[in-house]
Amino acid sequence: MVTTLRQTDPDFEQKFAAFLSGKREVSEDVDRAVREIVDRVRREGDSALLDYSRRFDRIDLEKTGIAVTEAEIDAAFDAAPASTVEALKLARDRIEKHHARQLPKDDRYTDALGVELGSRWTAIEAVGLYVPGGTASYPSSVLMNAMPAKVAGVDRIVMVVPAPDGNLNPLVLVAARLAGVSEIYRVGGAQAIAALAYGTETIRPVAKIVGPGNAYVAAAKRIVFGTVGIDMIAGPSEVLIVADKDNNPDWIAADLLAQAEHDTAAQSILMTNDEAFAHAVEEAVERQLHTLARTETASASWRDFGAVILVKDFEDAIPLANRIAAEHLEIAVADAEAFVPRIRNAGSIFIGGYTPEVIGDYVGGCNHVLPTARSARFSSGLSVLDYMKRTSLLKLGSEQLRALGPAAIEIARAEGLDAHAQSVAIRLNL
């Protein structure tokens, strides 16, 4: 039975707080094993990759090679349905156009004292994109991670993807070429993260690593952080749908299940002010569950982590939605636009009944790599800015140094940093 929380219940706040703090995935204690893998790849390079690939992915990289060849990518295009390739091209183009609008501008100005200040944006030189293998090997994720890097001007985009039993998803290779990925390597797991961070004989190191993965990949990203940058540690997917009774229950149910089929730990939440509508949506979910290829996964997700929150009024939904800070927030109420300015915490907002979150997953243009597990309270989805860095600029002449120098000397001496003070004083003959 799906969890139901009623705002009218006297213990609602207690139950809601417990709901927010509930864990949806068990954190495996893999740090020791991962550290051993990372250290070995750092020491042994390619030979460690070959050994781990034999053990974990049952593939002999000495025969296949670590790098994916252009011929293999050509073959992937030949194997891919033309209609799917065209759909991926549409998605790529829309992602590119939207992310191009995020490009920041350099700024340089002269203040009233004649001091020149500014900031300059430059792209990271090389980034690594981790793509999971198996059922989570999605070409859309390749586009979402690689296209902002391309727009930002990253020179070298490196993709690593495991090849269990030697198999690679051809659509992942197609998406990589469409997005301008520079190099592809058939390695996965913590060993791939280590290779990207420290380099091997075959794989040159990068400056930042992005992309989702399992507990081993997440642990490896945490371990190498500092040597390289990372994007985020993503958790299971989630959606919050705020909907009134004028919606078609089947539509809302389909949107809830679109998240539930991702993962048994995914979470789908309906928030409404109408109990009869909530029941209709629950019934629609049960009907649709049996039509899905991933029925077992979606059923477990909905059973274990699905929720219906009944509010007295949609005015009450806004602070609750901000506390949930969902990865995806659908607003399907009469005046959806009026809600948007009042939402502070959400990874991405989907406005109105004709904007299912799935469009954002694929072809909307906005990025689908978003903060999960309430981290939208303090972080944002992937963007062009994740592949760029800002450098401050400052220029003084002798007059400006004379104007500002004495104050700098005073602060330096107050902090007990004599060399700091002398650095300015020596120029002013003080």
Swiss-Prot record:
Binding site for NAD(+): Y130, Q191, N214
Protein name: Histidinol dehydrogenase
GO MF, one annotated term: histidinol dehydrogenase activity
Species this protein is from: Brucella suis biovar 1 (strain 1330)
Higher taxonomy: Bacteria, Pseudomonadati, Pseudomonadota, Alphaproteobacteria, Hyphomicrobiales
Active site positions, chain numbering: E327 (proton acceptor), H328 (proton acceptor)
NCBIfam families, sorted: hisD (TIGR00069)
Entry-linked HAMAP family: HisD
Enzymatic class: oxidoreductase
GO biological process: L-histidine biosynthetic process
CDD domains listed in its UniProt record: Histidinol_dh (cd06572)
Reaction(s) catalysed by this chain's protein: L-histidinol + 2 NAD(+) + H2O = L-histidine + 2 NADH + 3 H(+)
Cellular component terms (Gene Ontology): cytosol
SUPFAM superfamilies, per database record: ALDH-like (SSF53720)
Cofactor: Zn(2+)
Residues that hold Zn(2+) according to the record: Q259, H262, D361, H420
Entry function: Catalyzes the sequential NAD-dependent oxidations of L-histidinol to L-histidinaldehyde and then to L-histidine.
Gene3D superfamilies with a match to the protein in the record: 1.20.5.1300, Nitrogenase molybdenum iron protein domain (3.40.50.1980)
Keywords of this entry: Amino-acid biosynthesis, Histidine biosynthesis, Metal-binding, NAD, Oxidoreductase, Zinc
Binding site for substrate: S237, Q259, H262, H328, D361, E415, H420
Residues of the signal peptide: none
Pathway given in the UniProt record: Amino-acid biosynthesis; L-histidine biosynthesis; L-histidine from 5-phospho-alpha-D-ribose 1-diphosphate: step 9/9
